[in-house]
Regions:
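A short glycine-rich, Lys/Arg-flanked "PGG" loop and its adjoining helix->strand segment in the class I
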Residues: 140-152
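Class I SAM-dependent methyltransferase Rossmann-like catalytic core
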Residues: 12, 16-50
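Conserved SAM-binding loop of SAM-dependent methyltransferases across substrates and taxa
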Residues: 63-75
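Conserved beta-strand signature within the Rossmann-like core of class I S-adenosyl-L-methionine
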Residues: 153-160
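S-adenosyl-L-methionine
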Residues: 89-116
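Core SAM-dependent methyltransferase catalytic element
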Residues: 181-197
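Conserved class I S-adenosyl-L-methionine
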Residues: 53-62
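Conserved SAM/SAH-binding beta-strand->alpha-helix loop
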Residues: 86
Length: 197
């Protein structure tokens, strides 16, 4: 029992060191000061319909905490397409989650980045991209692009650490809903969903 606890604590420490190194290498690419909590990750994955028969798109998986929650939700590794900008995080993810379709690329250029998956329809999108680090026109263009890749009524879920939606309202184009506020995260996390109007 004590050995398992030491192993878990060791893995958690390794994960936090990896996250910190990623943050040091590219602070604009990493939007938080700590990895997402497992509680927040499970809440994010809760919007997925694992019985839809459609793959799931994940953006900004970082160290893989959200990836793990998506897989635990019942999504098969082959049905998860995950885009990570950081090469260091990408290499770690490929080693840690065999069978998941990881792509090292830019979420703001999905037609090029997704390659063979560019015409896929996804059940939903789970995003941990640090949107507040980007100009508003890029944020809204990304949300519009993501909504074109999922069925009407299905969500794009975005985590953020600000008090309001990181994307401006466009009621004629999409609906914004505050999904949850998770205190058990450092910093506390706001979850937002976007669906086609």
């Amino acid at each position: 029992m004590e050995l398992r606890l030491k192993e878990r604590l060791g893995r958690k420490f390794d994960e936090e060191i990896r996250f910190f190194k990623g943050w040091m290498d590219g602070p604009k690419q990493v939007g938080a000061i700590c990895p997402t909590s497992s509680i927040t990750a499970r809440r994010m994955a809760s919007v997925i319909n694992p019985k839809s028969g459609l793959p799931v798109l994940e953006l900004g998986p970082g160290t893989g905490i959200i990836t793990k929650a998506i897989l635990q939700r019942g999504v098969a590794p082959k049905d998860l397409v995950s885009v990570e900008y950081s090469t260091g995080f990408y290499q770690h993810l490929v080693r840690s989650f065999p069978g998941v379709n990881f792509i090292n690329g830019d979420a703001f250029d999905l037609d090029r980045t997704l390659g063979a998956f560019k015409d896929a329809t996804f059940d939903s999108v789970i995003s941990a991209i640090p949107l507040l680090s980007f100009p508003m026109d890029q944020r809204t263009a990304l949300i519009e692009d993501l909504l074109d890749r999922i069925p009407a009524g299905r969500p794009v879920l975005q985590i953020t650490y600000g008090p309001v939606s990181p994307v401006i309202a466009r009621p004629d184009r999409y609906k914004i809903k505050h999904y949850d506020f998770v205190m058990r995260n450092i910093p506390p996390a706001q979850l937002w969903t976007y669906t086609r109007a």
